[in-house]
């Protein structure tokens, strides 16, 4: 079955709030085999809402509305749908009692417009609002399913999980949707697509959806099957084919981000880490400490932005700074080795480069060197030539640092 999500509210059109409900609902609907092909946003205007309803009825089996169930005059969703379906609005006694009791408890006047929140479509299945006033509702009429939900996410999300999804399962084929995200780094989206283009072109079940995100590329594999284990087998087969071709760039699944994977591997190896940050100015250390329990492996870091700190704290030779420059392979080498020794860590990592927007030491913005020194191993320096804004260059440099750390840890 196909669904359309219609968000009602002028504040959405004005950009005053983001439509996070649509993202949540699309993901949840996909997981129970309901396709979402359209998101519509319409203001608080009954004529435009009516047109949106008519358009959605032409292309969707399920129409899901969020917003417009409140007590004010511009809350028009129920009234407009009632008129469209030629159904009366009636009071839901449970909702009316809930709202009435709230006003009694707070000592406020229970006005007629507040009673409006308890109105539901005649014959509808009513969804209790456990976190607010206005109930939701579901109606099956003329071969279409109409779902009305409150706009505030704190009300809508728990209502969907507790009441709406079980209701919608009555209209699905029973197919389960299983998804797995493969995460890649060090390869561009276009390069990766070329290597797996035939798999993408031939996709049916599972489907393959590539997505680039600031230096990373993900492939979302999605399979449908009434049996979850069979869906997993379908995905595993395609994953194996993909990793045969681009496995060297693969680092994790789903929400396993680079910094998490690198730190978890560091913990398993029982090794400690220190960082020297010039270009990144603490970004790397900040992401390290986002991981719980990291104090067992992270010794600390030095933000060595000024050359005096590079020379006098981290003992980069003056000759290197004068001859090769602070932005150089040689400087990154010394920074990584010496921060490791200074903080008595097993591994030292360093970042030096030009974030821009102007050149420095006659080197263009995006010129970056990441140093990696590991006790008992030869120190490596990875030169990078990055593009983007100042902040993007710094953030991408940090990601490359985690990537090279992760790959090196896999080897030892």
From Swiss-Prot:
InterPro entries tied to this protein: CinA (IPR050101), CinA-like_C (IPR036653), CinA_C (IPR008136), CinA_KH (IPR041424), Competence-induced_CinA (IPR008135), MoaB/Mog-like_dom_sf (IPR036425), MoaB/Mog_dom (IPR001453)
Gene3D superfamilies hit by this protein: 3.30.70.2860, CinA-like (3.90.950.20), MoaB/Mog-like domain (3.40.980.10)
CDD domains reported in the protein's UniProt record: cinA
Top-level taxon of the source organism: Bacteria
Similarity comment: Belongs to the CinA family.
Protein's recorded name: Putative competence-damage inducible protein
Gene from which the chain derives: cinA
């Amino acid at each position: 079955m196909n669904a359309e999500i219609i968000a009602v509210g002028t504040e959405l059109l004005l950009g005053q709030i983001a439509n996070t409900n649509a993202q949540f609902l699309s993901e949840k609907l996909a997981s129970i085999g309901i396709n979402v092909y359209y998101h519509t946003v319409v203001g608080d205007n009954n004529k435009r809402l009516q047109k949106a309803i008519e358009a959605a009825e032409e292309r969707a089996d399920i129409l899901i509305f969020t917003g417009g169930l409140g007590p004010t005059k511009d809350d028009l969703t129920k009234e407009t749908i009632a008129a469209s379906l030629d159904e009366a609005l009636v009071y839901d006694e449970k909702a009316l009692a809930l709202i009435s009791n709230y006003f009694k408890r707070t000592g406020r006047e229970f006005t007629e417009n507040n009673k409006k929140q308890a109105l539901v479509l005649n014959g509808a299945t009513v969804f209790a609002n456990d976190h607010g006033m206005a109930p939701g509702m579901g109606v099956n009429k003329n071969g279409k399913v109409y779902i009305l939900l409150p706009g505030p996410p704190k009300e809508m999300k728990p209502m969907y999980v507790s009441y709406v999804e079980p209701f919608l399962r009555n209209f699905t084929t029973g197919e389960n949707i299983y998804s797995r995200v493969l995460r890649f780094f060090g390869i561009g989206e276009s390069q990766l697509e070329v290597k797996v283009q035939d798999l993408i072109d031939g996709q049916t079940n599972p489907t393959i959806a590539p997505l680039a995100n600031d230096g990373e590329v993900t492939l979302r594999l999605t399979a449908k099957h009434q049996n979850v284990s069979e869906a997993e087998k379908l995905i595993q087969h395609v994953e194996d084919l993909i990793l045969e071709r681009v496995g060297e760039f693969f680092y994790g699944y789903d929400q396993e981000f680079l910094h998490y994977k690198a730190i978890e591997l560091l913990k398993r190896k029982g090794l400690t880490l220190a960082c020297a940050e010039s270009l990144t100015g603490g970004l790397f250390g900040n992401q390290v400490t986002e991981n719980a329990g990291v104090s067992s492996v992270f010794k600390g870091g030095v933000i060595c932005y000024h050359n005096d700190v590079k020379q006098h704290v981290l003992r980069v030779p003056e000759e290197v700074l004068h001859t090769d420059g602070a932005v150089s392979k040689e400087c990154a080498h010394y920074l990584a080795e010496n921060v490791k020794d200074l903080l008595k860590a097993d591994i030292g990592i360093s970042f030096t480069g030009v974030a821009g927007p102007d050149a420095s030491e006659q080197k263009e913005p995006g010129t970056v060197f990441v140093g990696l020194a590991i006790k008992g191993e030869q120190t490596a320096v990875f030169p990078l030539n990055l593009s983007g804004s100042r902040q993007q260059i710094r953030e991408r440099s940090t990601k490359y640092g985690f990537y090279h750390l992760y790959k090196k840890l896999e080897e030892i």
